[in-house]
Amino acid sequence: MGRHRRGRDIHGVLLLDKPQDISSNDALQKVKRIFNASKAGHTGALDPLATGMLPVCLGEATKFSQFLLDSDKRYRVIARLGQRTDTSDSHGQIISERAIQLSQVQLDAALDKFRGDTMQIPSMYSALKYQGKPLYEYARQGIEVEREARPITVYELQFIRWENDELELEIHCSKGTYIRTIIDDLGELLGCGAHVIYLRRLQVANYPNDRMVTLEQLYELQKQAKDQEIPVGELIDSLLLPMDSAIAHFPEVNLIPVVAAYFKQGQAVRSAKSPALVESMVRVTEGDERKFIGIAVINDDGLVAPRRLVVESRD
């Protein structure tokens, strides 16, 4: 007897509006249970303090989550000036308090230093791993690990307001950028210290923020399904974006079914309409319905060579 698969073969991306004070993994597990999905993964953790867009990939969509990890992000952040904490946010312990003695001109000049391409040393309170363990585990033991500065890009850093000891900013940045570290570094540059008291992720890649869904909305739909004695999927599956939405910007190669059959077996195939760029990544679809079947690269021979394939569900 074959092993019974747990959960549904449901595939797609849910844009979860993560609530405050739960971990990204806890939020992921709640979504997985509500959808009764056999497989799920998120695309870039948010701190427990943070709220906002957390794309949750279900089923075969998990194969393409790396492209969301690599994408740009946009955040709204409120910092408290005059206090520095060990975690660079309000969940940590205050380690210094200093007077706020600066002008708008000084603030603007300091903010400008964080725009564009810079190098950032990640916080000890991050999920980056050192010798197989997250840095935050070392930090909780009082162990400081040397970290290398990493290149980041801040495409846009917009000043929103400065009132008393609160500074509000909107930041559009590259992958791997730690907003807490930007705020901590800014506080040190200003000479007063700073830490994050509010953080919301507004956008990941080009996903529309009006498609975000809260856990409360999911629970309400789950309750409605139970009351109506219908499968919960009838009410919530329509909330999912297509599994290839993370790579919608890739050039498309459409294969006729007879050629697609070879591609789905892992073979490189020829397409009359392949993009000219060798080694370019493409999104592969099948037939007139343009069903997404995987991603590929165009190899030196001009063939469409599979890189990741969608495994079709078998009843």
UniProtKB/Swiss-Prot annotation:
Species classification: Bacteria, Pseudomonadati, Pseudomonadota, Gammaproteobacteria, Enterobacterales
Positions of the catalytic residues: D47 (nucleophile)
HAMAP family referenced in this protein's UniProt entry, alphabetically: TruB_bact (MF_01080)
Biological processes per GO annotation: mRNA pseudouridine synthesis; tRNA pseudouridine synthesis
Pfam families associated with the record: TruB-C_2, TruB_C_2, TruB_N
Gene that this sequence comes from: truB
Catalytic EC class: isomerase
Family to which this protein belongs: Belongs to the pseudouridine synthase TruB family. Type 1 subfamily.
Listed name of the protein: tRNA pseudouridine synthase B
